[in-house]
Amino acid sequence: MGQKINPTGFRLAVSRNWASRWYASNRDFAGMLAEDIKVREYLKAKLKNAAVSRVLIERPAKNARITIFSARPGVVIGKKGEDIENLKKELSRQLGVPVAVNIEEVRKPEIDAKLIADSITQQLEKRIMFRRAMKRAMQNAMRLGALGIKIMSSGRLNGIEIARCEWYREGRVPLHTLRADIDYGTSEAKTTYGVIGVKVWVYKGDTLGRGESPGAKLDAAPSDEERKPRGPRRDARPGSDRPAPRGARAPRAPAGGTNTAPADGSDKPAEATPGSDAPKTTVKRVRKAAPAAAADGTKTE
């Protein structure tokens, strides 16, 4: 069922970390979780045009720290930081504690799954063909270093009456491999025909540690210092001849000595002579000649 499960939840505590990092008792957990959901919905609506990839919420003692990962940090900050100050006040009012807002820039939005899905949905709402939008996003992702990408759109594609699902994949997307860094994102396009859902999987490489970005590569090439010097070639080693080719075999020696033909001229093989140093016996077979005809023409019996 690796194709069905959420790739982010499948890799939590293995190669991924949580998007909300705080601890609460059983009595306070539900209320704090509801606050997190409201904050994320508010930021999604408020920063719709800021290309927000994800939101990280941390809660130290009687405080809150929210990190916004965006491809357009200038839109979030606003002129002279006015927008971000208003954002802090609103978030502090919702959470009831002082809030610190940090902005992190997404360097490559073309390989971020959430931003790819949002870009495709915006194009679908502008009545652009879904196949063209999907293939263009795949080409940009592979060009900027993604090892594989898969995009799936489902709904009333092109306004058809019966909803269907269509997906494209390029490269490899190992969903069952836990160490694989799979970035997963979804988005919805609200069209006149209904809602079209878009899912994106991006394979960025293998990771060893737990975090948001790919860690050390498992198949990284060793450095020059780690490489051991190679020995001489086989045909250049002193005191050794060049080895025979793999396919050639040496002739097999007889196990019990040499076999000789019988002296009586029969077809039966003679018994092996004991020892390989025994002298070889040569047997010459003589064919009986027919009697010559008489000189006077008479037959001889």
Curated annotation (Swiss-Prot):
PROSITE patterns: KH_TYPE_2, RIBOSOMAL_S3. GO terms for molecular function: mRNA binding; rRNA binding; structural constituent of ribosome. It comes from the Bacteria. Residues 224-244 have a biased composition (Basic and acidic residues). One of its GO terms (biological process) is translation. SUPFAM superfamilies: Prokaryotic type KH domain (KH-domain type II), Ribosomal protein S3 C-terminal domain. Residues 39-107 form the KH type-2 domain. Residues 245-257 have a biased composition (Low complexity). Residues 211-301 are annotated as: Disordered. It holds the Pfam family Ribosomal_S3_C. The keyword Ribonucleoprotein applies. Belongs to the universal ribosomal protein uS3 family. PANTHER family: 30S/40S RIBOSOMAL PROTEIN S3 (PTHR11760), SMALL RIBOSOMAL SUBUNIT PROTEIN US3C (PTHR11760:SF19). Part of the 30S ribosomal subunit. Forms a tight complex with proteins S10 and S14. Binds the lower part of the 30S subunit head. Binds mRNA in the 70S ribosome, positioning it for translation. This is Small ribosomal subunit protein uS3.
